[in-house]
Amino acid sequence: MSASELATSYAALILADEGIEITSDKLLSLTKAGNVEVEPIWATIFAKALEGKDLKELLLNIGSAGAASAPTAAGAGAAAPAEAAEEEKKEEAKEEEESDEDMGFGLFD
């Protein structure tokens, strides 16, 4: 993340903390006050992305979204050992077939 993106993010957090509506003009004025040069496009992008959203609520819900996806990951992980066991059985079967081919007669060795 570039310095201008980071500064714009911090400016949005400051505005949200104060309960002020997040607009591109306000983001630019905050970044200018912090002596950070930001292209106006970044302020516009951040303002449109956060328009009509409660930034504090979004930040509070970050942890709950991670907890909800954890059981899904655990379910997918449980399938992996079963697949590995099937692959091992197939490999063992192939090894047995190969060992049957070499009976040790060695007629033409």
From Swiss-Prot:
Residues 94-103 have a biased composition (Acidic residues). Residues 68-109 are annotated as: Disordered. GO terms for cellular component: cytosol; cytosolic large ribosomal subunit. Residues 68-83 have a biased composition (Low complexity). CDD domains: Ribosomal_P1. It is found in: Cytoplasm. GO terms for molecular function: protein kinase activator activity; ribonucleoprotein complex binding; structural constituent of ribosome. Pfam families: Ribosomal_60s. It comes from the Eukaryota. Disulfide bonds: none annotated. The modification Phosphoserine is found at residue 99. Keywords: Cytoplasm, Phosphoprotein, Ribonucleoprotein, Ribosomal protein. One of its GO terms (biological process) is cytoplasmic translation. Its main location: cytoplasm. Yeasts contain 4 individual small ribosomal A proteins (RPA) which can be classified into two couples of similar but not identical sequences. Each couple is distinctly related to one of the two A proteins present in multicellular organisms. Component of the ribosome, a large ribonucleoprotein complex responsible for the synthesis of proteins in the cell. The small ribosomal subunit (SSU) binds messenger RNAs (mRNAs) and translates the encoded message by selecting cognate aminoacyl-transfer RNA (tRNA) molecules. The large subunit (LSU) contains the ribosomal catalytic site termed the peptidyl transferase center (PTC), which catalyzes the formation of peptide bonds, thereby polymerizing the amino acids delivered by tRNAs into a polypeptide chain. Belongs to the eukaryotic ribosomal protein P1/P2 family. Component of the large ribosomal subunit (LSU). Mature yeast ribosomes consist of a small (40S) and a large (60S) subunit. The 40S small subunit contains 1 molecule of ribosomal RNA (18S rRNA) and at least 33 different proteins. The large 60S subunit contains 3 rRNA molecules (25S, 5.8S and 5S rRNA) and at least 46 different proteins. The acidic ribosomal P-proteins form the stalk structure of the 60S subunit. They are organized as a pentameric complex in which uL10/P0 interacts with 2 heterodimers of P1 and P2 proteins. This is Large ribosomal subunit protein P1C. It comes from Schizosaccharomyces pombe (strain 972 / ATCC 24843) (Fission yeast).
